[in-house]
Design a protein with these regions (language model features):
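Short beta-strand/loop motif that positions the catalytic acidic residue
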Residues: 246, 252-254
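Cap/lid segment of the alpha/beta-hydrolase catalytic domain
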Residues: 81, 85-88, 92, 105-128, ...
Length: 343
């Protein structure tokens, strides 16, 4: 017993001394041209520093050298109007445990540019951009030597959850916008653009054009992705048939009081049809934005809508659970049996 306790203490101390590094990750955008900004997080053998990137307090050391060995890769897709650092605590947590994590900023659908909302460049382009990020890392000699191409996963929140489902093989049916907006016409987040199209008498034509564009930039699905961790997804566009082609294990997390993407029409509507679903977590009393990293005082002051939770919801504690769920899920879904793992 004493020997086992000693080994546990050594392992715990070793883990405490490990840190995370990160550096910019520019990726060519195959949808719009130009470059997508992003970051890559990775494990270090020394403790992390705390640095500021805009309003984000990131617990990772910029530019530090990644540890040796082949590691699993996870790509993170942010929500509508989000940021490449919107889930930095999850990226750091996974990096602490031996993962390489890439976070990208989706063009035309981020905090400083929403001009692509509702267009094919966003609704079809998002999964293509995730695939391009994987391509870029595997084509880079430095990162290729650090990544195990057989252990790749994806994380997505909100519109990023929609993105992750598509990368995992789901096929949306855009006419479901009409069905949903007939039931919930006052949902400004989802239905405002459709209402404008309806006034022009063109909503059916526009949705049909979106459907026709599903493979405009290639197949949105990526067979290299072996696991998808999905948070509060925009999933009302998927029916049973569209979900039947998902090839990867899934974990689904949603907020009980989400009034942006109501669970009844999104997370809970798809859960019964996810044949590869391995786990589901309901966050009691929380709203949609609880999945974003806990906010710094600066971010809370400038963006209270995405930083404010009900009094009974502690976002820091919620994220301890989210990060633990993600780690457990990816460890089970991506680890190759019998292979010696880093960390």
């Amino acid at each position: 017993m004493a020997a086992l306790l000693c080994l546990w203490l050594v392992a715990a101390l070793a883990q405490a001394d490990e840190g995370a590094g990160f550096q910019p990750l520019p990726v060519d955008d195959p949808v719009n041209g130009g470059t997508m900004p992003g970051f890559v997080f990775y494990p270090l053998v020394e403790p992390s520093r705390i640095v500021w990137r805009g309003p984000y307090e990131v617990h990772a050391t910029p530019g530090a050298r990644v540890t040796d060995g082949s590691k699993p890769l996870v790509v993170v897709s942010h929500g509508h109007g989000g940021s490449a650092l919107g889930h930095h605590d999850l990226a750091v947590s996974l990096a602490h445990h031996g993962f390489i994590v890439a976070t990208i900023e989706h063009p035309l659908d981020n905090f400083h540019d929403l001009s692509g909302t509702g267009t094919a460049k966003v609704l079809v382009g998002r999964p293509i951009q995730v695939k391009a990020t994987i391509d870029a890392l595997l084509a880079d000699a430095h990162w290729n030597a650090k990544i195990d191409p057989g252990r790749i996963g994806v994380v997505g929140f909100s519109a990023g959850g929609y993105t992750a489902l598509m990368v995992a093989g789901a096929v949306p049916r855009f006419s479901r916008f009409l069905d949903y907006c007939e039931l919930q016409p006052h949902d400004a987040e989802i239905c405002s653009a459709l209402a404008k199209a309806k006034l022009r008498g063109s909503e059916g034509t526009e949705l049909a054009a979106l459907q026709a564009d599903l493979r405009k930039w290639g197949n949105p699905a990526d067979s290299r992705v072996k696991a998808a961790f999905v948070m509060a997804p925009l999933s009302l566009l998927f029916d049973k048939a569209g979900l039947s082609s998902i090839h990867a294990p899934l974990f689904l997390s949603y907020a009980e009081n989400d009034d942006v993407l109501v669970p009844k029409y999104n997370a809970l509507s798809v859960a019964p049809f996810l044949k590869t679903l391995t786990g589901i977590n309901r966050i009691p009393k929380a709203g949609h934005y609880v999945f974003l990293s806990p906010c710094s005082p600066q971010l809370a002051a400038s963006a209270p809508a995405i930083c404010t939770d009900p009094p009974e919801v502690d976002r820091v504690s919620v994220h301890e659970r989210i990060n633990a769920d993600a780690l457990t899920f990816f460890n089970q879904a991506l680890r190759i049996p019998g292979q010696v793992q880093d960390h």
